[in-house]
């Protein structure tokens, strides 16, 4: 099987499994000009009729972080022109924004990029945003969460379909994307910061994953199977937690007696829903009130008090 057929086959398999496109007509591609987004664009143009898409357009966000940023922007404009595609370009000083808002460059860049994409989505009437996240991105994300401490959600990473975001390359490996691009003779730009191992994600990409692949050369495929198992188990837990939440929640209170009878995994999920927080320490602080009296201050005006068999927000919020 040639590289193009391999990638197309995996994209179609994902569509069969997840129905990532189900009625969407106008798709906006988050386009950096890198090999991933170039291949994604080529694939969606090829499958445009198959997915019944009316329009596929590009959106490029210039982070103004690198000297080559202007070069990348010009490449993206030329790429769109060659294919007679509409392109929207945004630009913002990410470094200045990060400093003003006490955010990392990565956090600030992501925030501004998605803000721009969603503004275009809404103002221009697109149905969804397609991003070029692939299987290796998923693996890196999962490993990053693992190093910081996480539960099922972190290990699962991102999903192929989340709100307005679509990730058609979810099943595709980075190596398969690169082989596709070379096979088709596609041009792209390189982001030199992808090789800076001072960045945690890059360190995982260039140092950790190669070592893991020495243990299991089919690491990505094995990981994807694990993610599918974890997603099914999370779905079951979420369904059970939702049932329990409806059973134990009365207004701004939880029924402690009923909640204490349930497994720890469900207790935590119900508490997370109730307080609107995923932070492990905060969830455990609240859970401690199931065993004793007292109160917990979660900040932002959220105070929880144990009142006999009830755990309630006080004052009510």
UniProtKB/Swiss-Prot annotation:
Pfam families: ATP_bind_3, TilS-like. CDD domains: TilS_N. GO terms for biological process: tRNA modification. It is found in: Cytoplasm. Keywords: ATP-binding, Cytoplasm, Ligase, Nucleotide-binding, tRNA processing. InterPro entries: Rossmann-like_a/b/a_fold (IPR014729), TilS-like_C (IPR054377), TilS/TtcA_N (IPR011063), tRNA_Ile_lys_synt (IPR012094), tRNA_Ile_lys_synt_N (IPR012795). One of its GO terms (molecular function) is ATP binding. It is an enzyme of class 6 (ligase). One of its GO terms (cellular component) is cytoplasm. Its EC number is 6.3.4.19. Gene3D superfamilies: 1.20.59.20, HUPs. ATP binds at residues 32-37. The N-terminal region contains the highly conserved SGGXDS motif, predicted to be a P-loop motif involved in ATP binding. Belongs to the tRNA(Ile)-lysidine synthase family. This is tRNA(Ile)-lysidine synthase. The lineage of its organism: Bacteria, Pseudomonadati, Aquificota, Aquificia, Aquificales. The gene is tilS.
């Amino acid at each position: 099987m040639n590289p193009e057929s391999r990638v197309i086959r995996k994209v179609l398999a994902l569509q069969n499994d997840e129905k990532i496109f189900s009625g969407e007509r106008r798709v906006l591609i988050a386009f950096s000009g890198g090999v991933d987004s170039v291949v994604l664009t080529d694939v969606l143009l090829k499958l445009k009729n198959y997915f019944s898409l009316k329009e596929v357009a590009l959106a490029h966000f210039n982070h103004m972080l690198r000297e080559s940023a202007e070069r990348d922007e010009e490449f993206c404009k030329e790429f769109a022109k060659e294919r007679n595609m509409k392109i929207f370009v945004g630009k913002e000083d990410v470094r200045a924004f990060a400093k003003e808002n006490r955010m990392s460059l990565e956090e600030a860049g992501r925030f501004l990029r998605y803000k721009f994409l969603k503004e275009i989505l809404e103002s221009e009437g697109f149905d969804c945003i397609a991003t070029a996240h692939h299987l290796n991105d998923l693996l890196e994300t999962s490993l990053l969460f693992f190093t910081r401490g996480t539960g099922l959600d972190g290990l699962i990473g991102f999903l192929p379909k989340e709100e307005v975001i679509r990730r058609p390359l979810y099943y595709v490996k980075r190596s398969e994307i690169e082989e596709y691009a070379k096979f088709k003779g596609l041009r792209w730009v390189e982001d030199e910061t992808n090789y800076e191992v001072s960045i945690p994600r890059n360190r995982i990409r260039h140092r950790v994953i190669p070592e893991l692949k020495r243990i299991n050369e089919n690491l990505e495929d094995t990981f994807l199977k694990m993610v599918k198992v974890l997603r099914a188990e999370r779905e079951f837990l979420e369904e059970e937690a939702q049932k329990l939440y409806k059973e134990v929640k009365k207004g701004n209170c939880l029924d402690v007696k009923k909640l204490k009878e349930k497994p720890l995994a469900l207790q935590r999920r119900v508490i997370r829903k109730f307080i609107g927080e995923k932070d492990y320490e905060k969830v455990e602080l609240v859970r401690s009130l199931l065993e004793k009296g007292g109160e917990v201050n979660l900040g932002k005006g959220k105070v929880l008090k144990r009142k006999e068999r009830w755990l309630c927000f006080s004052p009510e919020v």
